[in-house]
């Protein structure tokens, strides 16, 4: 694959939220996960874990938990006061593609949930201890939380996973929103170990639509220091 072919693959990938009523072969999903584990990761800790869900009852349970969590938050007076959970409109004049057709989360033929295992980092302990007596170390604690190397590592694996699924002709979308309101419920369904956090939900299937997309010019998001 040359650079132009790779660019075509990357630029044609879209978040898919509507799927054909067609099963996804388990072997394809296993292959995609195996390739995802070749993503770069801090200290080669490989602190990711993947749950491939093909059982429709489990997918429905996860979908129901997600909806219940969002409905719970929607019922808060704070949510009403802030104008709801819908993201703000883009700036006037900005070109926005039409929203993709959506299926219910429970309609996805398959789902991959991505976990991040917790592990102790000696550096974290050292910085935390020093922060008790050192103002700069206190700032370093904040920086370390922002950097979150283990989250970055798993996110790299997810990016690889989405690209491989696209190459296989499968559509997927990277979701975190439902976990903000139902993470504990979803982890209970999966029976995750106590040292693991589910950080992403990825419904997968054969696409039922072909959404378009736009990107900011690279000049708006990149600076060259000469």
Feature annotation, model-predicted:
Residues 1-226:
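Acidic, surface-exposed loops and disordered segments
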